Amino acid sequence: MLTEKSPIHVNSEIGRLKTVILHRPGKEIENLTPDTMGPLLFDDIPYLLLAQKEHDNFADTLRKKGVEVLYLERLVVQALETDEQVKAFFIDKMIAESGFKSGTIHAQLQKFLVGLPTNEMVDKIMAGVRFDEIELASKDLQNFSFDRTRPFLMAPMPNLYFTRDPSASIGDGLTINRMTFKARRRESMFTELVINHHPRFANKNINVWRDRNHVARLEGGDELVLSDHVLAIGLSQRTSSEAIKDVAKNLFAGSNYDTVIAIQIPQTHATMHLDTVFTMVNFDQFTVHPMILNNKGELPILVMHKDKQNQIKIESSNNLKTVLKEQLGLNELDLISTGDGDPIISAREQWNDGSNTLAIAPGSVVTYDRNYVSNEALRKHGIQVSEVPSSEISRGRGGPRCMSMPIYREDIEK
């Protein structure tokens, strides 16, 4: 049974948001260059000072709505300071996953990071360790063979401010995700550390529905908690069918969840996650990017149920409205088109995360101000919209939902 004392409690996308984890953009953003943007999954380089102001505005908007804001970087520092052995193990693992499992470069990086105060060490790991920050003896074969045209020994993590993706809260537990691309794969190590060692979360019987030690990819932007027993997952560029099956199997075996809806979307950079094209904004209202639907309003869907033998029963469909109404017990359903359905406007505003709303209560959402047509469409459908400035933070291809990891929501009235 779920309890009010559980540090993680998320049974919907729309229940009043009580606690969220954010990451304030840091020096990792300024370590992007034109040559590294592509591998690090960016299309442009945000102006850090303005990006920080915009992010602070986002955090303040949440606080004014009664949301407790926790910062990932502070949680990581607090977790590391609980035990020197935990800190040493984390450093060793982070260096190994940065490409140096052993050898003199590993040893030099370890010496460098251990010598920093914990808060500076965490900032440095997130920002990246440059080649010229470490003394490497050229006579050593590993050092001699290292490609010195690479600016970083440990690459920066500029996507960290999208805290949604490395993990996802579901019920009284979470998934800690195996990220798709190497540029983001280390990010879920921070979640793993915090859940296992931070006093707020450690030894609190939090269910980990799927950990990061898998090959099949899974990202939180594809995981949408539609109710206390229904989960939607995007089959996308960033989440595989194998991972969806894993999550369904584990939820069916250990939770109240009995339905997983797999929604297939185009596997492109613009539509990397389900929440870039589809989000829940009220009990019976959803945003949807019209491009993912064919001219009949259809797209491929698989509905997975737990049968009486605890096996997975799969049904196929192509009607999003019908599936949502049936699985959520709704008589009516309102799909609100990004860009108010205009093909040019919807494409432009979806690129700038017009579909990526963060619900802070039923019928109340946070959005980017730049998507003014989509915002007005939401208002026409009775949704309360709180807009935040977004000229720089939007350059990372993520919106308010992407930038937030809810860990506690109030249950919604049935």
UniProtKB/Swiss-Prot annotation:
GO terms for biological process: arginine catabolic process to ornithine; arginine deiminase pathway. The keyword Transferase does not apply. It comes from Oenococcus oeni (strain ATCC BAA-331 / PSU-1). Its EC number is 3.5.3.6. Gene3D superfamilies: Arginine deiminase (1.10.3930.10), L-arginine/glycine Amidinotransferase, Chain A (3.75.10.10). It is an enzyme of class 3 (hydrolase). It is found in: Cytoplasm. The keyword Hydrolase applies. The active site is at C402. Its main location: cytoplasm. Transmembrane segments: none annotated. It catalyses: L-arginine + H2O = L-citrulline + NH4(+). It holds the Pfam family ADI. InterPro entries: Arg_deiminase. Keywords: Arginine metabolism, Cytoplasm, Hydrolase. One of its GO terms (molecular function) is arginine deiminase activity. This is Arginine deiminase. Pathway: Amino-acid degradation; L-arginine degradation via ADI pathway; carbamoyl phosphate from L-arginine: step 1/2. One of its GO terms (cellular component) is cytoplasm. The lineage of its organism: Bacteria, Bacillati, Bacillota, Bacilli, Lactobacillales. Belongs to the arginine deiminase family.
